[in-house]
Amino acid sequence: MAAITASMVAELRAKTDAPMMECKKALTEADGDLAKAEELLRVKLGNKASKAASRVTAEGVVASFVGGNAGALVELNCETDFVAKNDDFLAFSKTVAELVATQNPADVAALSALPLDGSTVDAVRLALIGKIGENVSIRRFVRFETANKIATYLHGARIGVIVEYTGADEQVGKDVAMHIAAMKPVALSSADVPAELIETERRVAEQKAAESGKPAEIVAKMVDGSVQKYLKEVSLLNQTFVKNDKQTIEQMLKAANAAVQKFALFVVGEGIEKRQDDFAAEVAAQVAAAKQQ
């Protein structure tokens, strides 16, 4: 059997980006034949990628990019917070954000088909899955194109905001974006709050008010009051400015002769149900699988 040297492992790793141990295993299996080892490794990575691609991705990052008159916010998911800090994963996230801003894809499918590094975005994604051993997915993106100004804010890499605004002071845009990340409004104004959210809040308020035992007309006023309070709490313009509790966002903007046209807020994993592993069941499944082999 041919001796497997460190330089051979390094050369194979440079060609495939595979982990060192995987490279050594492939070279051993190929009896030192570099070309054969590369082929074996690509097959293994392909299998690894296809298996990983079915797993739940509830961790990840939000990335942003602003260039010219366009800006983008994207969410990419992985399986663990460890991989969410991986340099290759972070670099891919930033590249995807730039592609969204500059290429204006219609949806995630169109984005995935865009050319990248002599291949496509999706091919690069699959190669990344093979390299890091976890599923990686592009979940969503939003793109603003405007003659107005665009501001973005990232809180760590888990919360991202993009804002379209007008006004001479760029600090206003930064402040509004930071406020949105902290207070998480669901709409620009009370009139923009989705009807389904209002109905849910009204039902909750009705149930609480009904338990008070007060007359129907009082209950109706209590419900209306609760709904109005909710609308103020979740609409950006009505929220109290986090940097000055004496002002609402609307008042702050007016004082700065500025206005917000729209915004988007992404929180990593929002709405994704994380997989809760049953350790005992997992061990039992592994034992059963081993017996079948």
From Swiss-Prot:
Chief location category: cytoplasm
Keywords: Cytoplasm, Elongation factor, Protein biosynthesis
Keyword Cytoplasm: yes
UniProt entry tagged with the keyword Ribosomal protein: no
InterPro entries named in the record: EF-Ts_dimer_sf, Transl_elong_EFTs/EF1B, Transl_elong_EFTs/EF1B_dimer, Transl_elong_Ts_CS, UBA-like_sf
Compartments where located: Cytoplasm
The organism's place on the tree of life at top rank: Bacteria
Positions of the UniProt region annotated as Involved in Mg(2+) ion dislocation from EF-Tu: 80-83
TM ranges: none
Molecular-function GO terms, alphabetical: translation elongation factor activity
A single GO cellular-component term on record: cytoplasm
Pfam families from the UniProt entry: EF_TS
Xref: NCBIfam families: tsf
Role, per record: Associates with the EF-Tu.GDP complex and induces the exchange of GDP to GTP. It remains bound to the aminoacyl-tRNA.EF-Tu.GTP complex up to the GTP hydrolysis stage on the ribosome.
Annotated family: Belongs to the EF-Ts family.
Protein name per the record: Elongation factor Ts
